[in-house]
Amino acid sequence: MRTGMQAELVLDAKCATGESPVWRADEQALYWVDIPAKQLHRWHAATGEHSVWTGDEMLACIAPRAGHSGEWIAGMESGLFAIATRADGTLAASPIAGAAHAEHGMRFNDGRCDRQGRFWAGTMQMDMAAAHEVGRVYRYQADVNAGAALRPQFEHMIVPNGLAFSPDGKTMYLSDSHPLVQTIWAFDYDIDTGTPHGRRVFVDMKPLPGRPDGAAVDADGCYWICGNDAGLVHRFTPEGKLDRSLEVPVKKPAMCAFGGPQLDTLYVTSIRPGGDLSDQPLAGGVFALRPGVKGLPEPECRF
């Protein structure tokens, strides 16, 4: 069911590829990245203040790091880094683990932590038209037996996306947003070992409007995913049934995240493609929807 709920413009950020929105309750602020610009953005809800920091590599996905005030774990071009903001508008980046990319021209893409603080992130070939199945999905955790390690869990993907976890952490979601795939999978997830199993098709997005991009899970266990190219954000029940679709005034919503004091605002980042934007002048902006449900706090990385 498509609803006519009005999306509110939060910020006309003009991001080339706005991704990985994360709400920080301690700051009452929304963070996100602009991948090709190598930038981390922050918007304070109370004041509307907008800050930007620029790094040395493309910045694709972020998750807050527990016990390290102001620090993030980030998936970038060459691997995982711990990043922090500097007063001069730059990002300090300390390497954690390098990624064994299958070919040149790859970077990290979508990523987040599970409920236990393990970091999950996928890699992709930036030349999407090539449709090379060289993408991997990695898990990073501190292993008491083998030490901290970045290990591939899935291979032969094109554009891994849509990572999310159910409220109890026992279901993991993953998609491939390439036009040739457009599928969301669900897995049973062992919260003790961080091992997914029982892979099954959760939603085949090919008959639906939009390619599956970034995602979030609400407190009811429903799965929200941006319908890239369709200007929609879809909500699916835990059984994979389409519950509703909310419109945003851009063609390429990229990822969504719940935030606000009550976690009842759904923030949506977007992509600003090249070419004529007369029909979507706000492309690359950040939007807010109030869908009448609450989200969950974003898990922190625990390493």
What is each of the regions a protein language model found here?
Residues 6-12, 48-54, 94-101, 148-155, ...:
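A short beta-strand motif characteristic of beta-propeller blades
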Residues 13-27, 56-75, 101-118, 154-171, ...:
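Beta-rich, blade/repeat-based domains predominating
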Residues 24-25, 30-35, 72-78, 119-131, ...:
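Conserved beta-strand positions in repeat-built beta-propeller and related beta-rich domains
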Residues 39-41, 79, 135-138, 183-185, ...:
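A short loop-to-beta-strand structural motif that recurs across blades of beta-propeller domains
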Residues 84-89, 142-145, 186-195, 291-296:
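Short loop/turn segments immediately following beta-strands, especially the blade-tip
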Residues 90-153:
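Hydrophobic alpha-helical segments and helix pairs
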Residues 187, 203-241:
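Loop/turn-rich, solvent-exposed surfaces of beta-rich toroidal or solenoidal domains
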Residues 258-303:
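Blade-level signature of beta-propeller repeat domains, shared across WD40, Kelch, NHL, RCC1
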